[in-house]
Amino acid sequence: MHRLKQRYFLPIILALLCAGLGFWGCAASRTPDSESPAKIETAPPIGSIIPVRGAITHLHESDKKFYTVIDIVIGDHFQGTLPDDIDSITVTGPQGKLALGKRDFNYHERFRDFWISIPGAPESGTYTFTVTSGKRSGSATDTQSTPITIPLPDIRTFSPAAGETITKIPPHFSWQAVEADVPLYYRLDIKDMQDNYIFRTGYVKDMFSAHAPSSILKPGQSYRWRVRVVDGANWIELDNRAQNQWQQITVAQKLSEREYTYRVPPEINNDWQTSSLTEAGVDSEKIDELMHRILIGHDTVKNVHGVLLVKNGRLVLEEYFYGTHRNHLHPIQSDTKSIVSILMGIAVEKGFINSIEQPVLGFFPEIAPANLNADKRAITIEHLLLMAPGLQCRDSYRYKWRGLSEMRQSADWTQFMLDLPMAETPGTQFEYCNGASFLLSAIIQKATGMKTLDFAEKHLFSHLGITELRWPANPQGITIGWGEMRLKPRDMAKIGYMMLKGGNWQGKQIVSRNWVNESTQPHIKAGWYKYGYQWWRGNAILDNRVIEAIWAWGHGGQFIFVLPALDLVAVFTAKHYENPGFSERTFNMMNQYILPAFKLSLPPQQKISVDKKVLETYVGTYNFEHDGQTEIVNIILKDNRLHGYSNDEELVELHATAENRFFGRSKDIGGFKLQFVKDGNGEVFNFLLHFAPQFGLLRVPFDKVE
């Protein structure tokens, strides 16, 4: 065990985390980043095809003139060196081939983007973009609607204004709305004085302000910023855009931290009823502390994009950071899997699928799978739901998502999955497998005759009032079941609250209560967690009580937590892709801030007094050995009350519920329970520590050494 920190019980957590989660890593597949057009949402088949996407845009530039902008982006799966290995680029418009070649295009390495800006507005119609590399070629099309003029953002409304000095962090940028007859999406761009982008948000509908990360701006340096306004949610969909001239600002040598101010979430179009934290009986001090740490970009909580809390059916907290917004369609990554589970329940309930015990191969009679044997014939829908089909997926962080990458590059994803060799007997071993979730979507499409997206919109999203989302399909037209969905955070909370209420939303039963109960049961062991039907299940400890938790878990820090005992739904969005242990941050936020803030929802825990002579028998030094390392905990008496500490760090009071049973709360592991154990001679020889540092309930023995 490697000691990364010296805090109360934390080294234990780190060791057990590596041992318990190392086999599957970080929950879900990495999906494209909306901020970079270089990331292709759907994988091309392998072979001679170059993966390419293209877009044509009508630009209203800051010089008040109009331009035609062409972007041609080469996908990640291109095998070659860019830009050199692209031999030719041709563009054909409504009136025929344009007089353009590769040498006319600029190349942006970060985005793998060949681009050009041509004076004049584009013609309406369809454009085809073709690239070649040796004998390989690829093409894409984009249709330009009738160009409209989006007004330029008014720099007179900008804050900070041109020439202004920033004195507070995180820096806050704001502007007024642009008036137009179409929905508009805004993006904040920031560059350094060397013309390098250092920050930009995604395109967000009706976003008029944004905080940028504190770390991007250096004291005493100058920067430039602007706002883009477009008529689409992402670069491939928009037709028209406008952007103001760059505004130069300076950062003061000495900066002060911006204070967090709580505001009750607004009620919007009968979306959510809201109330204040105080009205909900929540300790707002803990929430304020967490929000402030996120706001200033503290290392332990940096890159958190959004936090939403629903208590007793009311939205009581809604905060967004780093340029995100309530209208932002955020990547929810593998939270998508949990939604696919709901859709499977609806499909069964409505009779499209007879039973989850049906064999998977029966849905694909046109496929003759390789490596066919009795085990493969025995794979059922339930095995896919449990991540236990027994297939050799090689599809987790441990394998660097090798299986997922190979599937995305295959000519037929369903065939690829069904061809995989067997590694285990179906239903016996949890092994994280994105392809299993993809097959669930493929089965829904086969059984219903509808794309999974269309089925979801008809039978789930429409009933929840979810009208805006993105959920792409693969090259064969099958909705991607493992991830890549984008939802607004408020809509993520609807999914969670519907599950909390047993499949019911505002009095309407969307999916049966039986399915909700069954899909969230602990069917199979998954590391130190349990796994249901594409839902995770674990525990937290709050004031000596073990609290059941159910959650959807998406790569990068996307979570939908459901805690029935507290009538609480917690939603987190983030961009925690830089570290395979990213999930630790979110669980720590839950344990250290969110759960303690809601402890008033539970009846007070009864505490008892224990005789001082008994307490004295517990005093001493205890250790726990793991992987050649020793964790030491000292138990002491202070003011006639029992306390524990490790490595001279946090002193934690132990509250008695019985003569030998205690509980407490550490800032590092959250709530815990502790039981002293005596030998046959009545001597205390160890204590048992029960804790749930990342919602995995653990039991660790500490032996008394002196």
Tell where the protein language model's regions lie, with residue ranges.
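Short, compositionally biased P/S/T/A/G/V-rich stretches that sit at domain boundaries
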Residues: E35-F66, D142-H172, Q176-V178
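Beta-strand-rich modules
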Residues: L217-W235
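A short, well-structured edge-of-sheet supersecondary motif
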Residues: H292-T324, D567-V571
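Active-site-adjacent helix/loop patches that line small-molecule binding or acyl-intermediate pockets
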Residues: G362-P365, N371-I466, P489-G503
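Active-site Gly/Thr loop motif
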Residues: T467-E468, V516-V571, D648-A658, S666
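Peripheral terminal and inter-domain segments
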Residues: S601-E706
